[in-house]
Curated annotation (Swiss-Prot):
Organism: Xenopus laevis (African clawed frog)
Name of the gene encoding the protein in the UniProt record: ddost
Gene Ontology CC: one annotated term: oligosaccharyltransferase complex
A Pfam family this chain is assigned to: OST48_N
Protein name per the record: Dolichyl-diphosphooligosaccharide--protein glycosyltransferase 48 kDa subunit
UniProt-annotated location(s): Endoplasmic reticulum membrane
Length: 438
């Protein structure tokens, strides 16, 4: 009996420990590295993720035990690829599994360099990003750092070249950004690609040790230094052409353009931008959700089984934003409601009313099956979509007006015809033909 109690106690303690560990574990993140030394050279970036609660698993990109999916389930929530020159991933990871991971809603952060391998190039093509050739680099003869060795590949990117989206790049002004790596261009037919950081008008991508004999792959503002993607399923991917961008040396380095009269900054803006990008790509920022949705006739509190045409209705929706791990009310002034039956019959702005958004409007004089639809798609935020289906019926016979003012001419014409027929009948019945004389 005592042994049975002891066994039950041990099992209970084990389940309790598993439950506690599951509650404490943060987002599971797999980090694929070029070599193990990256944990030291990029320690500030990884430490910031750990401090924010991420459960990091460090492995080399060619580790034979690598796996993203097991028994149809994703083993990780996020994927970091800091292995630019990898030619083949280890284990069962390949471009197909990474694409499936993105299709399943996973978040991916990719850092490349001039030594870029085919797998990252192929992954970029899947996401609408085209990397330049191996051994090429972004070159700018006007905006390079004072410590550049002479090839003008240590680029100083101004914060004015950042995407105007505080949710993605942060709200605070940034110092100039150091960049050394490969250039990218976006697929013009892919509207989901985000130009997060572009080169200046004097930048281009080419082989730094060769003379220019052909038109460069990327020129001017078309040269992407950092690009992003938010898929239609709200999965997020960020591509950086520079692995050094996330390094401790670039985080702590002073920065100054080589041009005379340029200002010197004690630190770059790399750390702040890297933190903002990681918070966005790993869905700590810019995540919206729909809370309670309600609708009813004005003056009532519950929805009817069916509305009647021309009813005055009130629609309310609660929209929340993820902030510091907590859901808080979202503040927006451009949220619209559509009342749709194939096409919108009503489109109006929702007004914030306390902790919810609401609006009152009159239903159209059209019956059928309609939807209250909120389709909110803004730069940097997850796609918010909410639909509620209702029925709108015509007026019942007892609900019509006894006399319709607009029908008075028809009433008059009907009664005039009746009156004329009555007079004609009297005249016709009492009319007597004159007798003919012999």
């Amino acid at each position: 009996m005592a042994s049975l109690r002891l066994s039950v106690l041990l099992v209970s303690v084990s389940w309790l420990l598993l439950l506690v560990s599951g509650l404490r574990a943060g987002p599971r993140t797999l980090v694929l590295m070029e070599n193990i030394n990256l944990r030291e050279t990029h320690s500030l970036f990884f430490r910031s993720l750990s401090d924010r609660g991420f459960d990091l698993s460090f492995k080399t990109a060619d580790d034979p035990s690598l796996s993203l999916i097991k028994y149809g389930e994703f083993l990780y929530d996020n994927l970091i690829i800091f292995s630019p020159s990898v030619e083949d991933f280890g284990g069962n990871i390949n471009i197909e599994t990474i694409s499936s991971f993105i299709d399943g809603g996973g978040s991916v952060l990719v850092a490349a360099s001039s030594d870029i391998g085919d797998p990252l190039r192929e992954l970029g093509s899947e996401c609408g990003i085209e990397f330049d050739e191996e051994k090429t680099a972004v070159i700018d003869h006007h905006n390079y750092d004072i410590s550049d060795p002479g090839q003008h590949t240590l680029i100083v990117a101004d914060s004015e070249n950042l995407l105007k989206a505080p949710t993605i790049v942060g709200k605070t002004p940034l110092n100039p950004i150091l960049f050394r790596g490969v250039g990218m261009v976006a697929d013009p037919d892919n509207p989901l690609v985000l130009d997060i950081l572009t080169g200046s008008s004097t930048s281009y991508s080419f082989f730094p040790d060769k003379p220019i004999t052909q038109y460069p792959h990327a020129v001017g503002k078309n040269t992407l230094l950092i690009a992003g993607l938010q898929a239609r399923n709200n999965a997020r991917v960020v591509f950086s052409g520079s692995l050094d961008f996330f390094s401790d040396s670039f985080f702590n380095s002073a920065v100054q353009k080589a041009a005379s009269g340029s200002n010197r900054y004690a630190k770059t803006g790399n750390y702040e931008l890297a933190m903002a990008l990681s918070r966005w790509v790993f869905k700590e920022e810019g995540v919206l959700r729909v809370g309670e949705v309600s609708h009813h006739r004005v003056g009532e509190s519950s929805p009817p089984s069916a509305y009647t045409v021309t009813d005055l209705v009130e629609y309310s929706i609660v929209i929340e934003k993820l902030s510091d791990g907590k859901w808080v009310p979202f503040d927006g002034d451009d949220i619209q409601l559509e009342f749709v039956r194939i096409d919108p019959f009503v489109r109006t702005f929702l007004k914030k009313n306390g902790g919810k958004y609401s609006v009152q409007f009159k239903l159209p004089d059209v019956y059928g099956v309609f939807q209250f639809k909120v389709d909110y798609n803004r730069l940097g935020y997850t796609h918010l979509y909410s639909t509620t289906q209702i029925s709108v019926r015509p007026l019942q016979h007892t609900q019509y007006e006894r006399f319709i003012p607009s029908a008075y001419p028809y009433y008059a014409s009907a009664f005039s015809v009746m009156f004329g027929l009555f007079i004609f009948s009297i005249v016709f019945l009492h009319m007597k033909e004159k007798e003919k004389s012999d």
